[in-house]
Amino acid sequence: MLSRLFRMHGLFVASHPWEVIVGTVTLTICMMSMNMFTGNNKICGWNYECPKFEEDVLSSDIIILTITRCIAILYIYFQFQNLRQLGSKYILGIAGLFTIFSSFVFSTVVIHFLDKELTGLNEALPFFLLLIDLSRASALAKFALSSNSQDEVRENIARGMAILGPTFTLDALVECLVIGVGTMSGVRQLEIMCCFGCMSVLANYFVFMTFFPACVSLVLELSRESREGRPIWQLSHFARVLEEEENKPNPVTQRVKMIMSLGLVLVHAHSRWIADPSPQNSTTEHSKVSLGLDEDVSKRIEPSVSLWQFYLSKMISMDIEQVVTLSLAFLLAVKYIFFEQAETESTLSLKNPITSPVATPKKAPDNCCRREPVLSRRNEKLSSVEEEPGVNQDRKVEVIKPLVAETESTSRATFVLGASGGCSPVALGTQEPEIELPSEPRPNEECLQILESAEKGAKFLSDAEIIQLVNAKHIPAYKLETLMETHERGVSIRRQLLSTKLPEPSSLQYLPYRDYNYSLVMGACCENVIGYMPIPVGVAGPLCLDGKEYQVPMATTEGCLVASTNRGCRAIGLGGGASSRVLADGMTRGPVVRLPRACDSAEVKAWLETPEGFAVIKDAFDSTSRFARLQKLHVTMAGRNLYIRFQSKTGDAMGMNMISKGTEKALVKLQEFFPEMQILAVSGNYCTDKKPAAVNWIEGRGKTVVCEAVIPARVVREVLKTTTEAMIDVNINKNLVGSAMAGSIGGYNAHAANIVTAIYIACGQDAAQNVGSSNCITLMEASGPTNEDLYISCTMPSIEIGTVGGGTNLLPQQACLQMLGVQGACKDNPGENARQLARIVCGTVMAGELSLMAALAAGHLVRSHMVHNRSKINLQDLQGTCTKKAA
C-alpha cells in the first residue's frame, strides 16, 4: 500500500516538474519572507543594544567545532568523489543541485527557528552536512538515467520512489526520534545541536520527496536528444540498476526500526506531555536569553547601516576557526575540479570499453539460430581474441555459430571456378554405360522421336542435334534445362547456341557454369542461364552488435571496401560495441485504381479510412497467407486515380510476392463494394519499389532500424587516425549540408549503398533494392565527460530484406546467412531472423560510415584507393575487344 502511494507521488512529481519546482521554491521563500516581515523586529547590534553574557568559551570547544566543520567538509568531498567514479556528469550535477537546495531549505528553517538571527547558522551547517546522504539521491538518479525515453524517465522515477520512498521515510523518522532525544537532555548546547540535526533530516526529506525528483525529470528532459529519440544521458553501466535496486531492504531491519520508532515516540510523549518538564530541560526558556532579546535588559539604538549591510558585515567577519574551515573547503574544491579529473580518467580507463569485455546479456538465447559461448568448447579458439591483444582473453562472448545446411546436397555448396572445358569431377555412385552417338546429326524427325521416347530421351541425342532442334523451333531455348537429363547440360547447350551469335565466340570462356546446383535456380532465381558470376566474398568483423559478435560476409569488387568496413568494426568493438533497435517492420505495395469521377475516388478513400472498411479489407488480405498481416493503409488521390499503399508484416520473407497476392485479393474484395472501380495495376509506383522515393524515407518500408555507438577519443585517435571534432565537421558539411544542396532523398550518408549492396549480393537479397534500402542518415556528435568521444548513429527507414525465398535458397548464399546465424525462417518467432539481418546491415553500414568519414577527415581516402583499388597487372598485355577490332 505504501509503495503504491509513493509510486503515485513519484509519477505526479516527475510528470509535473515545473509546477513542483516553482511551488517548492515559492513555499521556501514565503517561509523566509513571513519570518522577515512578521517576526521579531529587535535585532541585536543593529537596532537594539543587547547585554553581553559572560560565558567562558573554552578553547577546546572552538577546536571541537572546527574539527566538526572540517569532518563535514571532508565527508561531502568523499561523497562527491565516489559519485565521480560512476562516470556520469548528470549524477554529479543532480547531486550537487540536491545539496545546494537542501542547504537553502535548511538555512531557511534555521533562520525561521532562530527568529532572524544568523549567527546560529554557522554552528548548524556542519550538522546539516554530516547528516546529508547522497546515496539515495544518486540511487533515484540512476533509476532515471537507465531510461531510454522521457516517458520511461517518469516511470522509472515513480518506480524508484516506490522502492526508496518507504525506506527513506522510515529512516528519517528514526533519525529524528533518535536525535530528538538529545533535546530533552537539559544540556543547552546539546539541545541546540540536536535541534539542528532534526531540522537537517527534515529538510533533506522534504527536498528528496518534492524538489529533487522533479528536478531530475526536468534536467533529463531538457538534455534529451530529441532528434535521435535516444537520451544522451544513458550510460551502459546503469543497464542493470533496476535489478540491483529491486532488492528491497531486509524485513528484519525494517521491523527493528519500526519497533524502535514506537519506543522513541513513547519516550518523547512521556517526557514532553505526561511527566512534569523541569525548567532546565526546555530550550524555550533560554531562547530569548540565547538570542539576547530580553525586554528588561535590552536598549533601543538607531541603526547606523542598512539591515543587509549589517548582515553582510557579520557574515564577512571571520574568526581563525572559520578561516581554517574555508581554506580546507577551498583546497578540496581546487583539488576536485582541477587535479581530480586526471586521476579519475586514469581510473576509469581501467574500466574503459577498450579493454573491457562485451557484456553478454542474461536473456535466454532464441531458437532462431544456434549460439554457443566461446569458452564452452575447450578446443575452440576465438580468432578475435588472438588478433586483438588488448582484449581480455578470459571474457565470455556470445558468438553466432554457423548452422549446418539441412540438405542432402550440402557438398555442392562449393563449386569449381574456371574454364568450361575439361573433365568434370568424378560422379558419386555407379557409372552408367556410355551411349554411342553418331558423329553426324540425324534428321529432325528422328531426333524428335528419340526426344519424346520414354525409353530414351535427350541423353540419346548429341549437343549438335539438340541445337539443330532449337534452331528449327522444335525446342524452346528457355526449356533446355527441363528437357535435358541434367540442368548443367541445358546450360552448356545454351552457351554453345549463344557463342555463335556473339562478336567474340570465346567470350564465355571465363564465365564458369560447371558444378553448380541449378535445380535451386530454375523457376526461382534466373531464366536462360548461361553460368554463374563468381564475385569475391570478403569478411568484415567481428562486428560487436547488441552483445554478440558477427562475421559479416561482403561480396564486392571494390577494393578497400571490406578493409575499411573491417576497420570500422574494430573501432566499434574497442568502443564497447554498438546497439540497435528495429523501429518498424512492414513491406508495402501500392496499387493504382480508377473510378469514374474524382468524387467517387474520394468516397472510396473515406470508406477505406473507416474502421469498418479497413476491417473488411484486412480480412480479405490476411486470408491469403499465414504470415501476411495487414497493418495499415495509406491512401492518396490524383484526380480520379486512387493510390492505396498496403503495409503488412511478411515474416522472414522480404515479402513482395506475399503482399502482392494479398493486395490483389483485397482489391477484388473492394470491387464488390464499388463495382465501378477499375484496377489499373497492382503496382502503381506508390510502394515504392526499387526507385528513389520520399514516401519510403518518411513512412518507411521493410525494416526501419536505428544503430548507435560511442567511440572513445583514444580509439578515434589511434584506430581511425583523426579527431572527433574533424569527423563531426566533415559529417555536417558532407552528409547533411552537401546532400541537402544536391536535393538528395535519403542520401544523408557517405556510402551506405556500398555496404548494403555487398551484403545483399552475398546473402541472396534483391540487389536492385539497394536503391531504397540504402536510405540512411548518419549523425555524429561529441560526447563523454570531456566531449572528446564520438557518438555516431545511423537510421535506415527502408531496409527491404529477408532470409527465405529468392536468392536465399541458393547454397552459397545460404552459407553466408549461416555465418550470421539467420539462415531460413525462425520457427519460434516468425520474422526474427529477417529483423536480425536488418540490424546487422545497419550496424555494418555504421562501421563503413565510421571508417570512410575518418579517412575523409584525415585525408587518407585517395592515397588508400591508389594503393589498394588499382590493378597492378599490365593491361597492355591483355587484348581487349576494341583493340582487336581496331587492329
Curated annotation (Swiss-Prot):
Glycans are attached at N281. The lineage of its organism: Eukaryota, Metazoa, Chordata, Craniata, Vertebrata. The modification Phosphoserine is found at S871. This is 3-hydroxy-3-methylglutaryl-coenzyme A reductase. Residues 40-56, 115-123, 188-191, 276-314 are lumenal. Pathway: Metabolic intermediate biosynthesis; (R)-mevalonate biosynthesis; (R)-mevalonate from acetyl-CoA: step 3/3. It is found in: Endoplasmic reticulum membrane; Peroxisome membrane. Changing H487Q: No loss of activity. One of its GO terms (cellular component) is endoplasmic reticulum membrane. GO terms for biological process: cholesterol biosynthetic process; coenzyme A metabolic process; isoprenoid biosynthetic process. Belongs to the HMG-CoA reductase family. Homotetramer. Homodimer. Interacts (via its SSD) with INSIG1; the interaction, accelerated by sterols, leads to the recruitment of HMGCR to AMFR/gp78 for its ubiquitination by the sterol-mediated ERAD pathway. Interacts with UBIAD1. Regulated by a negative feedback mechanism through sterols and non-sterol metabolites derived from mevalonate. Phosphorylation at Ser-871 down-regulates the catalytic activity. It comes from Mesocricetus auratus (Golden hamster). Changing H474Q: No loss of activity. Its main location: endoplasmic reticulum. It is a multi-pass membrane protein. Its EC number is 1.1.1.34. The active site is at E558 (charge relay system), K690 (charge relay system), D766 (charge relay system), H865 (proton donor). Keywords: Cholesterol biosynthesis, Cholesterol metabolism, Endoplasmic reticulum, Glycoprotein, Isopeptide bond, Lipid biosynthesis, Lipid metabolism, Membrane, NADP, Oxidoreductase, Peroxisome, Phosphoprotein, Steroid biosynthesis, Steroid metabolism, Sterol biosynthesis, Sterol metabolism, Transmembrane, Transmembrane helix, Ubl conjugation. A motif (INSIG-binding motif) lies at residues 75-78. One of its GO terms (molecular function) is hydroxymethylglutaryl-CoA reductase (NADPH) activity. There is a cross-link at K89, K248 (Glycyl lysine isopeptide (Lys-Gly) (interchain with G-Cter in ubiquitin)).
